[in-house]
Amino acid sequence: MSGFSFDSNIVIDALAGFAPARAEIRRAFSSGARGWISRMVWIEVLSKGAPATMGRAEAFLSRFGVDEIDAEIAERAAALRRERPRLKSPDAIILATALTRGRLLVTRNTKDFPANMPGIRVPYIL
């Protein structure tokens, strides 16, 4: 795995000032790797919160590279949904993005991404 992809919950927690989320993002960036998010994470983050906070959220998101949802990611997400029918499309896209790009997915969503699943990092649980 080379680099880190962040799930929506980690980014939203960091925006809310939750210290463990902020520390996890700092840790990833300080390792010299670039932090990445899927376009799906970008959508989920910007769909939450009050309009007055959108500027701050957009500025925070601009620190990350954004992986667009291309055909390869879409095909991988569809395959993941066939394998795991209960996996929702946004989560399948987020996981497919990390897997396709060869990155570790940093999340606290242990319902959809178990901590013992290869390629998953769960830094904390609420």
Regions found by a protein language model. Give the residues of each.
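Short, well-structured N-terminal submotif of metal-dependent ribonuclease cores
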Residues: M1-I37, L46-E58
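Short active-site oxyanion
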Residues: S31-R34, R63-G65, L99-L104
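Donor nucleotide-sugar recognition loop
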Residues: R84-P90
